[in-house]
Amino acid sequence: MPVPIVIESTGRAERAYDIYSRLLKDRIVLLGTPIDDQVASLICAQLLFLESENPEKEIHMYINSPGGSVTAGMAIYDTMQYINSPVSTLCMGQAASMGALLLAAGAPGLRFSLPHSRIMIHQPSGGFQGQATDIDIQAREVLRLKQSLNAIMSQHTGKPLEQVALDTERDYFMGPEEAQAYGLIDRVLTSRSEATDTISK
């Protein structure tokens, strides 16, 4: 699918942007695909660039993602925590698996969802092949990642680690209100003005 081009008029001049560059100008980062290494590199680069532009100003991350690679998702997560700029997150459509973790990892008070989105949490999975020893090594690594992800989710939601571990044993789907009660988001938004009101407070 071709990337749309938008034309912006400034006085007597006109300038053409691809839509993602235009959003970046407003400090908006869009995660709208499954998460892989290439996507993670692009998202991390945008976050680092926006921090260099103004480390005190908020960055808006809009999420519509089914999740994906754990290591790629953790690169985005660590970058969000590393930079000085606060990152607000907003789920539009769905935030599943690593997408849900990134949604929950937004700055406190700045984690939102639109009213008809869905959020899903679960444990990491992997398909293993090879010799028994290799399979055992991979299985132990998945267990390590599971414990790490559960600890992060517990930290950002305020839920006990044991509860998170239980809830992520299988796919756990939530609507926005349930996700708010769980601690994954802070507020359900129906209009942009509501987000502005929240930030101004």
UniProtKB/Swiss-Prot annotation:
Taxonomy, superkingdom: Bacteria
Catalyzed reactions per annotation: Hydrolysis of proteins to small peptides in the presence of ATP and magnesium. alpha-casein is the usual test substrate. In the absence of ATP, only oligopeptides shorter than five residues are hydrolyzed (such as succinyl-Leu-Tyr-|-NHMec, and Leu-Tyr-Leu-|-Tyr-Trp, in which cleavage of the -Tyr-|-Leu- and -Tyr-|-Trp bonds also occurs)
Protein name stated in the entry: ATP-dependent Clp protease proteolytic subunit
Matching InterPro entries: ClpP, ClpP/crotonase-like_dom_sf, ClpP/TepA, ClpP_His_AS, ClpP_Ser_AS
Organism ancestry: Bacteria, Pseudomonadati, Thermodesulfobacteriota, Desulfovibrionia, Desulfovibrionales
Family: Belongs to the peptidase S14 family.
Function: Cleaves peptides in various proteins in a process that requires ATP hydrolysis. Has a chymotrypsin-like activity. Plays a major role in the degradation of misfolded proteins.
Keyword Cytoplasm: yes
A Pfam family that the UniProt record links to this protein: CLP_protease
HAMAP family: ClpP (MF_00444)
Alphabetized UniProt keyword annotations: Cytoplasm, Hydrolase, Protease, Serine protease
